[in-house]
Amino acid sequence: MRILFVAAEAAPIAKVGGMGDVVGALPKVLRKMGHDVRIFLPYYGFLPDKMEIPKDPIWKGYAMFQDFTVHEAVLPGTDVPLYLFGHPAFTPRRIYSGDDEDWRFTLFSNGAAEFCWNYWKPDIIHCHDWHTGMIPVWMNQSPDITTVFTIHNLAYQGPWRWYLDKITWCPWYMQGHNTMAAAVQFADRVNTVSPTYAEQIKTPAYGEKIEGLLSFISGKLSGIVNGIDTEVYDPANDKYIAQTFTADTLDKRKANKIALQEEVGLEVNSNAFLIGMVTRLVEQKGLDLVIQMLDRFMAYTDAQFVLLGTGDRYYETQMWQLASRYPGRMATYLLYNDALSRRIYAGTDAFLMPSRFEPCGISQMMALRYGSIPIVRRTGGLVDTVSHHDPINEAGTGYCFDRYEPLDLFTCMIRAWEGFRYKPQWQELQKRGMSQDFSWYKSAKEYDKLYRSMYGLPDPEETQPELILTNQ
């Protein structure tokens, strides 16, 4: 099939959040499966510093009384064709900045629609988040082009109809929706980035005021868990960690713990229970729970803690002050560094992720990949990727709790701290986690099924002829 991914982000050249990871990784796997997948992305002013882009455009268009160009390149490190939407509104900017984002991304969406109508006609346009929400509305009049809309962040829903009427063409059937709700209604298929989150957003607690609409269209709503690049993030070959290792050579992993303790200024002690956290410091990630509980946990145990991330100033200050109370046992790094994050995954014993809500989550999968046991709240994608440790039946991959309460988090962390004492069981838990398949190939197979379902095509894995052996 001919599939065009339209999005505001695509790793590794333009990434802020998880959407960039999906758009940067999924197309190259789908191409290996036989699909002709391409990406349509804004031509941000910083892109020439990150990749080679031909000077001359391949096409010129007109949308919302604006001229624009389209340049063709290749996504670095892949064979995926990349179309760059050129307009002065995107040239001097970061990905998200300024007060005119609603106008900029509506123009971008309009340009993508014109491109599909007039230059490269796909079978499917795969749209991502509100920035591309108008495309399913416009394509509703093009029955030969179908649309998939993926919700990465339901909290940001884009401009409303009253504003859109002022800047672009809004079909009469769009009614009074914002762009997110309009996309949900008119896309041929809608998905989120985990099955559990797909169910949760149909409730008032998670639906961001459009839970009624999401329930109404539940027949075309599904959830597909994101993946991670298991070739890039591989503890057996990672050049950023002190000692490479596998599930069969877990004893080597201790060198990463000692190296991490030395790097971040913790007391070097391979027997100390070391917890890591790599996160945005925002309420969604459970920072209010951590602040209420961590002081008590550190006082009650001999554990160590290392934090990497940035976010709200309040949470940054609180975590910094908390670290100052436990010198040699707690380290706080208010920044983001990919290499250090890998060393935290590879060197910690457990990884803390007590999210209030979590559409999918990548960090828990990275932690499992590197042998760090997740401590998570059962919500969204965390339910679909981490199962609670059951030592009797030798099952599970982490420690889980349900209620969003400090005491519940404290109790769960104490259980993990106590479980760490039993080294043989702990290593078996690590091995189960490291054996999980979080590759993009697994996710791509689910998207392939989704695309095929839109055209009534069978799943190739279910239509393989059965081999029957007979005696001659």
From Swiss-Prot:
<dbReference type="GO" id="GO:0009011">
    <property type="term" value="F:alpha-1,4-glucan glucosyltransferase (ADP-glucose donor) activity"/>
</dbReference>
<comment type="similarity">
    <text>Belongs to the glycosyltransferase 1 family. Bacterial/plant glycogen synthase subfamily.</text>
</comment>
<dbReference type="Pfam" id="PF00534">
    <property type="entry name" value="Glycos_transf_1"/>
</dbReference>
<keyword id="KW-0808">Transferase</keyword>
<dbReference type="GO" id="GO:0005978">
    <property type="term" value="P:glycogen biosynthetic process"/>
</dbReference>
<comment type="function">
    <text>Synthesizes alpha-1,4-glucan chains using ADP-glucose.</text>
</comment>
<protein>
    <recommendedName>
        <fullName>Glycogen synthase 1</fullName>
        <ecNumber>2.4.1.21</ecNumber>
    </recommendedName>
</protein>
<keyword id="KW-0320">Glycogen biosynthesis</keyword>
<comment type="pathway">
    <text>Glycan biosynthesis; glycogen biosynthesis.</text>
</comment>
<dbReference type="InterPro" id="IPR013534">
    <property type="entry name" value="Starch_synth_cat_dom"/>
</dbReference>
<dbReference type="InterPro" id="IPR011835">
    <property type="entry name" value="GS/SS"/>
</dbReference>
<feature type="binding site">
    <location>
        <position position="15"/>
    </location>
    <ligand>
        <name>ADP-alpha-D-glucose</name>
    </ligand>
</feature>
<dbReference type="InterPro" id="IPR001296">
    <property type="entry name" value="Glyco_trans_1"/>
</dbReference>
<dbReference type="GO" id="GO:0004373">
    <property type="term" value="F:alpha-1,4-glucan glucosyltransferase (UDP-glucose donor) activity"/>
</dbReference>
<dbReference type="Pfam" id="PF08323">
    <property type="entry name" value="Glyco_transf_5"/>
</dbReference>
<keyword id="KW-0328">Glycosyltransferase</keyword>
